[in-house]
């Protein structure tokens, strides 16, 4: 279905018995995360918290809590996405089977981002960071965190949405030394597009403009975690997966996703860091406090009746397990084309997905060698370690 909002998706899930509403007041300090965790553990439905203590906004979680539910959300477009990836792997398929792939090519063209749409619901009102549900997931967390953010940045040398990056990098909203409502923490690791953008901005002594989107059509959230080739924009992918073009405007020089439920805009200043964390992470342990980039908040926008999406990470399996399964279904066949010599890969969920990847490769180039020693396999391993979300 072509959802135009997070709420449209949640109403569809509810209509099919895949969501329940929690009308009682729930505390964002540990209680919401605990409810989410217990429901996820038993394969339960998506959750809509209608009465969040200390906030006038509703919150939703466990949206992608099972692979079956994720497939249901994207039931009309998954096959099209898989065909698009097939075409990327083997463009000659469009020549050999033109009628089979004609619709896929047209869908990709129609999915290009749309600037300045007539409706801009996210600009309904300006709010403060402290108005957002301040969800504290684990007892030793350093503050409230955004766990389903879509963090947007642009290349200052090649500005524009088609050269932009959309990634899921955790955001700390409160705690530590952050000035309330004026500063937030931005945490990202190696091989992330935003790092390239910040490096270029730092070299020029310029601040990097960053926008953090939350909510909106569920395809936007998935696009932020997809390991996409550099030539495919996350926003175009979101348009294909969601069967609806990514809509955006520029406001005060910042990109704003008009279909998002919330948007935080701000600047990352060169060389300015603050302690971020601790945070109960994917491995079931706390990632400790370290210096990470500081984002100075410019504006915070919210649509009418906005819904704050969140998840809880920790010792696997968790909701991000379903993300990994969905991504593997869509992209698994692409890996052998991207990395020659690789036959199959498997990210081990029990290890937290990122730390352990199993790969089956081949030794093709030294059949004359009397003793088989890893050679091509080492090349493959280094290729994997340097490949975006596989690393």
Q: At which residue positions do the language-model features occur?
A:
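Extended, highly charged
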Residues: 1-294, 298-391
